[in-house]
């Protein structure tokens, strides 16, 4: 799920496109350590051991994004995250815990951070802002909870004033991200968010958070992809009651689908 932020940084850099080729082995050897960054189930991301950036997003290839994060660098990753709102504590009107990317990262830590692990901290609101920002062709809006307050006579006492927070990515980059996220739902890890007759853009996330604990299942999405009406972020802590099958695609994506369907009816 945080891979969307990494891809945004890479595409904005100008040196990468969705067709850029990245390593996709079963496990990525990390510098400065004997540790590796494994892919899901310790299998390669493709038969050739290489993937394009788009393919890496579709199958959520950990080694590819770990390698990409190390190549673009910690500063670029933090700057891109900040453009989406990381580090801010917005008022909605109550204060919201800020999301964060660690300030100091060596190469192995940067690789782990690039798949949303190590010490990356995000809230559901922040990831909803990422989804909405991409859906809005790069423009991130300031969040709020209440659209309007209406009196007993149905007159509007107070209403929210939508304001732009930042331009996280260019419209071109947002369109490229949308293309990748639609493919993720059409044919990748997010198929359980598919809605008949609607193009859905989405990204799974499976966040480990301690030895012996089941992963948090995440999913972010927006729809319709060509004319977005809703953006969603779902987290199922500890995978809910999913048993051993805990992943964003299997647990959180169906919930996001139901939320989007309810809005689009």
Could you say what each language-model-derived stretch is?
Residues 156-161, 180, 252-265:
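Short, gly/Ser/Thr-rich active-site loops of penicillin-recognizing serine hydrolases
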Residues 236-251:
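A short acidic/glycine-rich loop-to-helix N-cap element
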Residues 5-238:
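Beta-lactam-recognizing serine transpeptidase/beta-lactamase-like catalytic domain environment
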């Amino acid at each position: 799920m945080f891979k969307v932020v990494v891809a945004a940084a890479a595409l904005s850099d100008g040196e990468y496109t969705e067709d850029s080729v990245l390593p996709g082995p079963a496990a990525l050897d990390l510098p400065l350590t004997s540790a590796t960054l494994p892919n899901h189930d310790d299998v390669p991301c493709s038969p050739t051991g290489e993937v394009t950036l788009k393919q890496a997003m579709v199958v959520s290839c950990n080694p590819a994004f770990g390698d990409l994060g190390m190549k673009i660098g910690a500063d670029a990753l933090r700057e891109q995250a900040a453009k989406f709102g990381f580090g801010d504590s917005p008022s909605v009107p109550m204060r919201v815990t800020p999301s964060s990317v660690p300030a100091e990262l060596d190469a192995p830590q940067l690789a782990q951070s690039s798949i949303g692990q190590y010490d990356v901290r995000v809230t559901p609101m922040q990831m909803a802002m990422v989804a909405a920002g991409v859906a809005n062709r790069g423009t991130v809006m300031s969040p709020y909870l209440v659209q309007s307050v209406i009196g007993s006579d149905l007159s509007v006492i107070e209403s929210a004033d939508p304001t732009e927070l930042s331009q996280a990515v260019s419209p071109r980059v947002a369109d490229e991200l949308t293309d990748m996220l639609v493919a993720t739902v059409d044919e990748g890890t997010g198929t359980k968010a598919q809605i008949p007759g609607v193009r859905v853009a989405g990204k799974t996330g499976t966040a480990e958070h301690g030895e012996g604990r089941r992963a948090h299942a995440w999913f972010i999405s927006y729809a319709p992809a060509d004319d977005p009406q809703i953006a969603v972020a779902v987290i199922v802590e500890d995978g809910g009651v999913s048993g051993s099958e805990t992943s964003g695609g299997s647990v959180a994506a169906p919930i996001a689908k139901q939320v989007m369907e309810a809005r689009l009816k």
